Amino acid sequence: MNSLLLKLLLCVAITAAFPADKQDEPPATKEEMAENYLKRFYSLGTDGGPVGRKKHIQPFTEKLEQMQKFFGLKVTGTLDPKTVEVMEKPRCGVYDVGQYSTVAKSSAWQKKDLTYRILNFTPDLPQADVETAIQRAFKVWSDVTPLTFTRIYNEVSDIEISFTAGDHKDNSPFDGSGGILAHAFQPGNGIGGDAHFDEDETWTKTSEIYNLFLVAAHEFGHSLGLSHSTDQGALMYPTYSNTDPKTFQLPQDDINAIQYLYGKSSNPVQPTGPSTPSRCDPNVVFNAVTTMRGELIFFVKRFLWRKHPQASEAELMFVQAFWPSLPTNIDAAYENPITEQILVFKGSKYTALDGFDVVQGYPRNIYSLGFPKTVKRIDAAVHIEQLGKTYFFAAKKYWSYDEDKKQMDKGFPKQISNDFPGIPDKIDAAFYYRGRLYFFIGRSQFEYNINSKRIVQVLRSNSWLGC
């Protein structure tokens, strides 16, 4: 509910600015960077009211806490490393919290048929690719609403689109490469609805930064009256996320917000989008779980949680923000401690990862490991370090793979029910940690002692996430 309300707040023109050319300025300290950030996106010292509303709290601290709360960070009021990390991410130039009205539907266009005009083109892409990206970005919104978008060429349009750099006379200068990627203005006359893209960025049509379609779709959300969302998986989240543009689906959070403003589409079957998993949702199901150089990685559709054993909370991020070339909705994953590589499986293919990089020569076919052609996918994979074996689970059977000999062990596959009594056949994920084997089946996890072949305890799957 908070996310939806935030998105329906009225966007306004941005008033504060970073230096137009960062290269001409001496490097800012973290404190200076944070102050500029809070001025620009949280109205530090410019919101027209008392900045210290809470007794005994300095304005900077209050705004910093506001920013930390918005991004779901631990609210410390101090410039801790996680807060600095978020502030340094590339993002949209529109306010997160600050000078906007709580008027909801009045922030929308008062018509359903809108026009747009592309004033100029970036040299980073062929003109046709820019036109396609812009058209597709508008289609993201027209697919879920009654809105239509028509391109015009000579007359002034509702939404004017331009590529520009530095100070471009709208009181919101760009800041050079990185930092702010683009900004847009609320619906209205004049500059209202217009979208500006920083020409100092490198624009692409691939998943490499920065994908024009993804940034444009976000900015056009502002052009239609949406504000930023606190939902990390939403298109209208302030920071840029490196996701595959080919498989992009408008998240449900964005659908709910835009339909509140303009109503539903005329499609007989209303489109739905993916939702962001909640850490303590009792219904969360993991696609795969693996260790990674001392950390734990939990995959859920297009997301992953990254958890250090000594950390109290897990960090949620897009899979493709971590590994840009990796597919989403993977089937299985495990870490080979000998090579320190992560093996990730989807369908009949698997990929080896060394840190953030895909190992050369991958993806490969799973049949190169010795699986019969009847196996179409792997349900779960886990490496048992004390045995030097990797177990692969598929349907009701499992295989044992010798990592030293690089071949399947003889006598396999075997029945899961025979060798792992009490464990259901259909396994979603598995991993080995500190001498215990953990099986994830639906919302439950089974802690298993491989020596005694007994279930030690049954817990909720997300207990690893602090729930």
Curated annotation (Swiss-Prot):
Please list every transmembrane segment annotated in the UniProt record, as residue ranges: none
Q: Which residues bind Zn(2+)?
A: 92, 218, 222, 228
Tissue spec: Expressed only transiently in whole animal, at time when tadpole feeding begins.
User: Entry cofactor note text?
Assistant: Binds 1 zinc ion per subunit.
Per the Swiss-Prot or TrEMBL annotation, the motif Cysteine switch is positioned at: 90-97
Named cofactor requirement(s) = Zn(2+); Ca(2+)
Q: Does the keyword section mention Lipid biosynthesis?
A: no
Q: Which residues form the propeptide?
A: 18-99
Its family remark reads: Belongs to the peptidase M10A family.
UniProt free text on domains: The conserved cysteine present in the cysteine-switch motif binds the catalytic zinc ion, thus inhibiting the enzyme. The dissociation of the cysteine from the zinc ion upon the activation-peptide release activates the enzyme.
Name of this chain's protein: Matrix metalloproteinase-18
Q: Which organism is it from?
A: Xenopus laevis
